[in-house]
Amino acid sequence: MKKILTLCVALLIAVTTISAKEYKHSLGMVAGLGIGAQYKVMVTDNFTIFEEFGYLGGCLADQTGALPANGAVNNLVRAYQANAAEGQGIKLDWYVGGQLKIGYLQGGAGIIGVGAVGGIEANMTNAPIAFSFDFRPGYGCVLADTGVGGVGAGHAFDFSFNLGVRYTF
């Protein structure tokens, strides 16, 4: 019990003394049309790459109506990021870029798509935490018959608003 208490106190001290002004890596969760894990790396001061893997839920709108979109998806996002404002313990950055989406839907159908990404990120300057909010419109192709309601393969437009929280290091 004493070792656990000592470890907890040490972690608390480490977390409260780490400054998150500038970070290279971050790891956390993102939620929007689906939910998943997100890893972000700052390649340069203004270029960032997000890698996301998670569960996709909801619908994709296509020319025949709506395709069920329950499945797994892997997003690779490349974005330009720049400082918007700083003060009161928060550093705001905005970012804009593109994404490549690869995954599968219920019934075994595959999906591949491209899209745009635009958002804002708030970095806590006194704690190693970052929050993000973004909008992601996209276009994708369903690669096989979904087997649901007779809807076959086709193209689909989708969009999502996403909220993320990450530990920065």
Residue ranges of model-derived segments:
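Cleavable N-terminal export/targeting peptides
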Residues: 1-23
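Short N-terminal segments immediately surrounding and downstream of signal-peptide cleavage
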Residues: 22-38
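Extracellular loop and loop/strand-boundary signature of outer-membrane beta-barrel proteins
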Residues: 24, 61-63, 147-151
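Transmembrane beta-strands of outer-membrane beta-barrel pores
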Residues: 31-35, 53-59, 100-106, 137-143, ...
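Gram-negative (and chloroplast) outer-membrane scaffold detector with strong preference
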Residues: 41-131
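Outer-membrane beta-barrel "beta-signal"
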Residues: 74, 156-169
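Flexible, surface-exposed loop regions and adjacent strand-edge segments
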Residues: 113, 148-156
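Internal, hydrophobic beta-strand segments that form the core of beta-sheet-rich folds
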Residues: 133-135
